[in-house]
């Protein structure tokens, strides 16, 4: 088979192998054929047919002298591994240019009955690394230290370095020599998934590329390689989802509805490998079957939520350990909560080559050092930390700012309405509907927080402005933003009950000001502004000539003034709130990770 099916459930039978390929695979752990049995039939050019005794009707694998590609044009025939590997490194400055060092190494090992299956030496000759089975490692170290005792004592060589808990992997295919880029593809795939290669070797025949990794990364390595070389018609993206409230639930509905289309048109397979919500979680490294939660043929988030209640209990530590411990390739953690504790896990995930997509704006608006550290960790590890929906839900605001800056433009000014709640309130207030009633309406219709003072304080807008300012290249924290309250501080100090009781006392002053504004053709807008590196949020009056004047309902709008878009700023406008558009923005971030 292409790989060990006990490790890779997508492994499948190989149609044809050459004698050389079969021998290479057997030497590296494939146990179906005993290597010494191949030689006699090879010299007589007798084909070998391997069949499954439990499924004799299957085609099986035929071994011949033919060394061509398989029927799908793949140069790689199979992947094999040895999981009990130890690596001994013989090193020293005196080894350079000295004849006979390697002869002494291998003569000593052979004299002590120690077999070696991997040798790696750079052209500098400063060191030679030797791979062998764990049971031989201690003895090999001992006899090599004895052999080179004089050089070690003189300081010309170092004591043998022994590394344990390793595994050796080999990719095999005679046609690799005719296919440029195999090694590049192999090591590039490993690197993108955070897998470091400790030693590697390739013979001049180019039939086998062998390399050593940490044993704990063996399963991940095999899956990554197999997916890259044998399942290339589908790119697999493994998703961990935390939070299945309105946004998370809508995201799952969108993924379930689009999954087949993505496989057909984009060759992208999205596997949901973990779902956590509240105190429960379910994990499956092969993918959670969303079809198990269908109602009349359609995915039901309500059914999933009911099923999750019966799942194993989970807490933050369990979530952290499962996501990292699953050690799965091409993975992304999606946070659809508002939890600061969940946001605190991002750095560990990024450090373990797990991309992060966050609808949660806590991390991106936290202290600047934390924000910068997350961005830098993602950059160094070659993964993504994306949070487009932190500002403007599904509106492409952050991506647009990033594109402008990456193309050499400079952000000079941002002017925006970023609170759908406040825009709804100030669009709804009228002679018939006083200010206090519009606040109640915003809460009842789901725009406002359960405690609407969170919205009225402008805190959420400040967070969004801080995020935009940072993405625009400015170092800013929340306390740096100048804030102007439009209701007295006393309304924020008391209880929520007192707030609702006293809120109507503001109606008269708001109505008097509204009448004056109406006569002057003005409207209220709660504006977030970045100018000359300074941020501010306040309630402003705009006239009918201002771009913010006609903003309807709970929509958001942003004006971006740059060196290039100077006289006429770029304008982005649309729904800035709502579960479905926010989920669509999260989905778009996930898709951009699939495209890297």
Q: Which residue stretches match the model-derived regions?
A:
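Catalytic, metal-anchored helix/loop core of enzyme active sites in primary metabolism
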Residues: 170, 413-418, 423-426, 441, ...
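N-terminal glycine-/serine-/threonine-rich beta1-alpha1-beta2 phosphate-ribose binding loop
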Residues: 238-244, 248-351
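C-terminal catalytic "cap/lid" subdomain
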Residues: 1-235
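Rossmann-like NAD(P)H-binding beta-loop-alpha module
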Residues: 379-382, 386-445, 455, 459, ...
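Rossmann-fold NAD(P)-binding glycine/threonine-rich loop
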Residues: 339-352, 361-388, 393-401
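Generic hydrophobic/aromatic pocket-lining and core-packing "Φ" positions
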Residues: 38, 106, 187, 252, ...
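Substrate-binding/catalytic subdomain of NAD(P)-dependent oxidoreductase enzymes
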Residues: 428-429, 436-550
